[in-house]
Amino acid sequence: RPPPIYKLFPSTTLFRSGIRGLIVYDEGLLWVLKEARAMGELPAEMKFKNSAHNGQGNPASFKLLEDLGADSINPVRDLSIPMLAALRQTVNVPLDLHTDNPPGSGGFIRVYEAPEMVRCCAPVYLKTGNSCVSGHGQLTTASNGIDMARQAHIVLEMVNRYYPEAIQLKAGEAEPQIAD
């Protein structure tokens, strides 16, 4: 049985407000949320994404996060393609993969790796646009938003060009799944 509902109050309030997913920064809270969802205290359709800030990057950690209730997992951002592929082989939930990073936390850009990320790791959510702001969690301006959209377009263009077999879900479609 999970600890008292006090930790969950913001989660239940958010769901009633229309929010259907949370980024979770703590493994213990992830377990509490999973248990609350299983007991019906949170709706079954409430999704939990594990944050890259948790710092996981190995298959054993990913399996644990999946078992703790993560519906998708963000690995640490600087893993090689073979390392990412090893994570995919371990879990069935979608991976959230960063294709770029703010200058304040590494500043890498992996646009040309995006097609291979999709090929090796699908189902994935490609996360892009972070390199357009100076640091993580900083407020974005309208200009940053335009740059982020441009960066997302470039990533999509690379995937379409170098891995045209990739299937992109349309807005409103079901979540990505491992193919049978």
Predicted feature residues:
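Glycine-rich, proline-tolerant flexible connector loops at the mouths of alpha/beta enzymes
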Residues: 1, 19-21, 174
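Single conserved hydrophobic/aromatic residue that forms the stacking wall/gate
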Residues: 2-13
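Non-catalytic positions within long, well-ordered alpha-helices that form the structural scaffold/packing
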Residues: 15-16, 66
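Short, contiguous clusters of charged residues that form electrostatic/catalytic patches at enzyme active sites
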Residues: 28-31, 150
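Phosphate- and divalent-cation-binding pockets in alpha/beta enzyme and binding domains
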Residues: 31-33, 83
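Catalytic alpha/beta core domains of metabolic enzymes, predominantly
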Residues: 38-164
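Polar low-complexity intrinsically disordered regions
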Residues: 165-180
